[in-house]
A protein has these predicted regions:
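Structural marker of alpha-solenoid helical repeat scaffolds
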Residues: 56, 90, 124-128, 162-164, ...
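Canonical tetratricopeptide repeat
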Residues: 66, 73, 100, 134-138, ...
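TPR alpha-solenoid repeat register
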Residues: 63, 97, 131, 135, ...
Length: 377
């Protein structure tokens, strides 16, 4: 699993921290309304309010940065870039705007440009501020994606000491991921344990630790993190079902997941579908994937998962439809898997020109994927 990077909380904090200057009453009211909508994740309404604020006072960087961040959440990257550029034209020292530009580049897979923007944001930000922390996390993520794992470790070193407690769980986890890539199991596990000191009840954290350790070749250590979940006092059918699925004990996974699914848990439907797929119960797997897709049409990961399922079933044309729908959603966290599977689909369909073009585009964004490089060459 590729390292996932959460930005919403940091964006909200950055928007809240921008100082208003020279604004009229109407613009200020629209800005406040926009912030309320943004904090409630109603980005369409937030964008409308921020646009009205900008129209009323086009010389206010806070309004432009807030609009750009909202456009980011709406995946309108060209519009977001324009908003951040306008803010920078007004204030060459606007760290928030440079950070926003970096996020646009990051989501578009333009990592060199992203690093330049984040570096600029860091140089303009307070040494203990959230903009600096957020920008350095992105900078390290760019290094990680491009295969500069030692560089990522060095960048995390700069952040961790001065980071807030709320950030440290994620930062230790991310540095641990980089250590795994450097084949440094000991330091990776030390960082994972430090991460758990700050956040010990997050199931996804254990699963991500399991996945990264397993992918790094440390299978026994990886499974120990999942088994710790089963030792918890709290009995959680969904948690147990997901854990048994990851451990490959599919009969027990079904036992727990079916119970949750019958109680209406949508996440249980997703994991139950994957469990049925692993058990070669394709009829039930297909039914549940379709059900989950119907309820989560904007989840790029499910399009990739279902696309991979269809590839394994030899239904390449159908798989391509779902994979390309997922790509259109523009989710950078899911994009690597989607782009890779798109290229694989073309190859299996014997459309070798399109397969080569797709692998070429993939390798521009993920140049260190040796398996993809081998396919391309």
């Amino acid at each position: 699993m590729r390292m996932r990077f959460i930005i919403n909380a940091a964006l909200i904090g950055a928007v809240s921290a921008v100082v208003l200057t020279g604004c009229n009453a109407a613009a200020n009211k629209n800005y406040k309304n926009g912030m309320e909508c943004f904090n409630e994740a109603d980005y369409d309404k937030a964008a409308g309010y921020f646009k009205q604020a900008v129209e009323a006072d086009s010389n206010n960087t806070a309004y432009l940065v807030s609009l750009g961040m909202t456009q980011l959440e709406l995946l309108k990257y060209d519009e977001a870039q324009a908003s951040f550029d306008s803010a920078i034209e007004l204030d060459q020292d606007c760290a928030d705007a440079y950070r926003g530009k970096g996020v646009v580049y990051y989501r578009n897979g333009e990592y060199t440009d992203a690093m330049e923007a984040f570096d600029k944001a860091v140089s303009l930000s307070d040494k203990s501020g959230q903009v600096r922390t957020d920008s350095l996390k992105y900078y390290a993520s760019c290094q990680y994606i491009q295969g500069d794992y030692q560089g990522a470790v060095d960048t995390y070193d700069k952040i961790i000491e001065s980071a807030s407690k709320s950030d440290k769980a994620e930062l230790y986890f991310l540095r641990g991921c980089a250590y795994i890539k450097l084949q440094d199991e000991n330091d990776a596990v030390l960082d994972y344990e430090k991460s758990l000191d700050y956040e010990s009840d997050n199931y996804e954290t254990y699963c991500n630790m399991y996945t990264n350790l397993k992918d790094g070749g440390y299978t026994e250590r990886a499974e120990s993190y999942l088994r710790r979940l089963l030792d918890k006092d709290k009995k959680d059918n969904l948690l147990f079902g997901k854990t048994y699925y990851n451990l490959g004990d599919y009969d027990k996974a079904v036992e727990y997941l079916e119970s949750e699914y019958k109680d209406g848990n949508n996440e249980a439907a997703y994991y139950l579908a994957m469990t049925y797929e692993a058990m070669e119960n394709y009829a039930d797997a297909d039914k549940l994937y379709q059900e989950y897709l119907g309820k989560h049409p904007n989840d790029a990961f499910i399009y990739n998962q279902y696309g991979a399922y269809l590839i394994n079933r030899g239904k390449y044309a159908n798989a391509l439809v779902y994979i390309e729908t997922g790509i259109e959603l523009g989710d950078s966290d899911a994009m690597q898997g989607l782009m890779y599977n798109q290229a694989v689909c073309y190859e299996y369909k014997h459309d070798y020109d399109k397969a080569r073009d797709a692998f070429e585009e993939y390798l521009k964004s993920y140049p260190n994927d040796r398996a993809a490089r081998k396919e391309y060459d």
